[in-house]
Design a protein with these regions (language model features):
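Conserved catalytic/switch belt of AAA+ P-loop NTPases
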Residues: 141, 166-180
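Conserved D-loop-proximal element of ABC-family nucleotide-binding domains
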Residues: 162-163, 193
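Conserved alpha-helical scaffold flanking the Walker A/P-loop in AAA+ ATPase domains
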Residues: 26-31, 96, 100-101, 127-149, ...
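Loop/turn-to-beta-strand initiation segments
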Residues: 146-151, 176-182
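Charged, glycine-rich active-site and insertion segments that engage polyanionic ligands
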Residues: 1-60, 64-84, 88-91, 95-101, ...
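Flexible beta-alpha connector loops of hexameric P-loop NTPases
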Residues: 120-130, 157, 201
């Protein structure tokens, strides 16, 4: 689904952010302390609002709401907790010039660093390269035109290659005055330790059911409460994940998956071939990826249950008998092998043009124990 068809705004244009009040209070407390770190590592699972939060901070700074210079976070500050704050907000009026400029990507004091376009292939790169990172140094040494702050959002820092990471590290080690760097990360543990140590870590949490329901009711007003709850549980508190699932027809796919899984270890060949056959057609690549991701997640839930010695909470009431029966079908090691196999097959399908129908059938035969 293209971004222009989305029913929800891009992070830079989003005015709605819920469930991250603790993180917001932490940043506001740092602003008032007079010791605002110049670099923030905004971390958490995908789809919970990290990039939206980064742009929320950017608007706040560019709106002239931060007084005093930024400070070097320094290695010793990485784990220190800041006092929380109550009663304030990072909200900037959506009708303001700053908000509109940030949303349009035209604010002169804001630089967004993302994966760029490969000039040779004209396709999006798979990583942020050193040329992207080098733009940051030149940008930060220019004179700010408005609030006095120059802000850089890197979304996501996980996608930087080593050369790009080293270029950003040099900036973090010697930041110019009134520079604010906001690094979005899904997996902070994989970053260079020296990058992590130069940033104030700000963890964002998956959203609770009430916050997810509020957001889904806003973005998907046509959906029932039952469907909103299904999306919430399937996405594990990720609003981005829930909206992407909805766009890909994930709810119907999950119900069909559960219908097939409920029959295991027996499989009805006609139903399996009908389900797998829908992914053969051109244009159904996203649906295939979604179905396989849902299947991998289902297997992962069973593997965790096997390790803990207790059944996972069913997402749909009708899947409980299948969970109970299948938990004893394989050992923990076998469930882990199946999880790896499904993920591996999914990754290789488009890379080497495997038959998507046969991949789905093969995955179910493996679950059955005959593949």
């Amino acid at each position: 689904m293209s971004t222009e068809d989305q029913a929800w705004p891009e992070p830079r244009a989003s005015s709605l952010l819920v469930g991250q009040e603790t993180a917001e209070a932490t940043f506001l407390a740092a602003c008032r302390s007079g010791k605002l770190p110049h670099a923030w590592l905004i971390a958490g699972p995908p789809g919970i609002g990290k990039a939206s939060f980064a742009y929320r901070i950017a608007r706040y700074a560019l709106n002239g709401s931060i007084e005093g210079p930024a400070q070097d976070a320094g290695p010793s500050l990485f784990g220190d907790a800041l006092p929380s704050s109550e009663g304030d907000s990072l909200t900037v009026d959506p009708d303001s010039i700053v908000f509109r400029q940030v949303a349009a990507g035209s604010h002169p004091d804001l630089l967004s660093v993302e994966r760029g376009i490969n000039e040779r292939t004209k396709k999006e790169r798979s990583e942020i390269v050193v040329e992207d990172a080098r733009r940051v140094a030149g940008f930060l040494h220019k004179t700010a035109s408005g609030s006095g702050w120059r802000v850089v959002v890197i979304d996501s820092v996980d996608e930087m290659n080593r050369n790009a990471a080293n270029a950003i590290l040099k900036i973090l080690e010697e930041p110019p005055a009134n520079a604010l760097l906001l690094l979005v990360s899904h997996s902070p543990g994989r970053l260079l330790p020296t990058i992590r140590s130069r940033c104030r870590l700000l963890r964002l949490s998956p959203l609770g059911e009430a916050d997810m329901d509020r957001l889904l009711a806003h973005y998907l007003p046509e959906e029932t409460g039952e469907n909103r709850l299904l999306l919430t549980r399937l996405s594990e508190g990720s609003i981005g994940g829930a909206l992407a699932l909805h766009a890909a027809g994930g709810m119907a796919l999950y119900r069909d998956l559960v219908g097939l899984l409920a029959g295991l270890p027996d499989l009805e060949a006609r139903k399996l071939h009908a389900f797998a056959g829908r992914f053969e057609r051109a244009g159904n690549e996203d649906a295939f990826q979604t179905a396989m991701a849902l299947l991998a997640d289902w297997i992962a839930r069973l593997a965790r249950a096997k390790g803990l010695g207790q059944l996972p909470q069913p997402i749909l009431a009708e899947e409980e008998p299948a969970l109970r029966r299948l938990a004893s079908l394989h050992s923990l090691d076998r469930w882990l092998e199946l999880w790896e196999k499904v993920r591996h097959l999914t990754a290789r399908t488009d890379a080497i043009n495997l038959d998507r129908k046969q991949v789905v059938i093969g995955a179910f035969l493996a679950l059955q124990g005959t593949g």
